[in-house]
């Protein structure tokens, strides 16, 4: 006879019961009407709802080591704190069933057939058998190898907490200690990071934005990088930083009394000279553009161009040759050039813009019969269409433009070119009024502005410079500045 018994092939009409997701296998054949007739391997079964706290026959406790009963093979029974948890349906079956301590032959064959590496570490002869407590609190040592066919597989997905609620027994003390430690660690993390909480989907979501992640470390890094304020003690008005919040509060009281506010930013000051210097250095350090209609200043030509368009919306321009009306001077000029080019040339000659007498510009338009072209004799422009040559002369040689510079008299057909031209006059110098936002490129214009705009509130004028003062005492204190120079 061989050392190992011959393996018996299992035949069944239900192969799915041999999968790893099945329950616990049968333990005895003598009970009919409760268990299935098939034999299942307990070694290959996954039991996610059973949490083992196995101490491997821990005899360290002298009080309980000698009181525990022993089995026929010399294995000690486990105490209540060492017992394992099994599903409640199995407990209800086992409470009303009497089992024999002898191991049936079917179970031996089943144990021999289980040779999977997954089950090798779960149940061996050296391990203690699973202990199941009945309602009478008597430890009965049995090996659980069977499960009822009526057992619901969904019960396997229940957590260990729900299994504890189903049983009338108190949970083991060791399990309570483990849960307390995990809860304590979670509370500590939530206290440190109150905004980081896992939602129902298992994702950690930031309460300050839409960011979410399944990792706590990613959300923690996101909060530090995106929402943690490192410059909390910085003044919003003057951008000055302070070491404490109390110093920032004391500093903020100074800005409540600031009478001078920059219209281009949030800068405030109690000294007007500081405001004037701030405007010149910050907003008009390189270029200065101002509107001649309302004296509003801009730091770029594009801003001035947009500002001019606002003025053009309020005004309506009427064509003098027809009833065309528009709010944009460029649109009016384009209309006159395209529709009334010949009449515009005649008007230019009458005003002497051409410089060669009446109809001088019209006489410059000739027709080349050899090449069948209309040619401009002023610049050589040519085209097969007479209207194209008339449009060219009206645009380039009539010197009638929608925008004309007041300083040099040069005209421009587009507002953007006109705004860029204003930069050429800034080389002579920029003169800013120290008492308001007025600026000009001519020193005489600034003097006239000071005499008319600030003579009432600042009647005392310095004879050596353009400074004005509200009282005579301030003027006297200012005069030593010129004596030292």
Curated annotation (Swiss-Prot):
PROSITE patterns, A to Z: ZINC_FINGER_C2H2_1, ZINC_FINGER_C2H2_2
One GO term describing the cellular component: nucleus
GO biological process assignments: negative regulation by host of viral transcription; negative regulation of DNA-templated transcription; positive regulation by host of viral transcription; positive regulation of cell growth; positive regulation of transcription by RNA polymerase II; regulation of transcription by RNA polymerase II; symbiont entry into host cell
The entry's keywords: DNA-binding, Isopeptide bond, Metal-binding, Nucleus, Phosphoprotein, Repeat, Repressor, Transcription, Transcription regulation, Ubl conjugation, Zinc, Zinc-finger
Annotated zinc fingers (C2H2-type), start-end: 204-227, 233-255, 260-283, 289-311, 374-397, 403-425, 431-454, 460-482
Region (Interaction with CTNNA2), start-end ranges: 371-455
Annotated positions of the Phosphoserine modification: 60, 88
Gene3D superfamilies, per database record: Classic Zinc Finger (3.30.160.60)
Keyword Membrane listed: no
Glycyl lysine isopeptide (Lys-Gly) (interchain with G-Cter in SUMO2) crosslink site(s): 76, 177, 181, 226
Protein family: Belongs to the krueppel C2H2-type zinc-finger protein family.
Protein name according to UniProt: Zinc finger protein 639
Organism: Rattus norvegicus
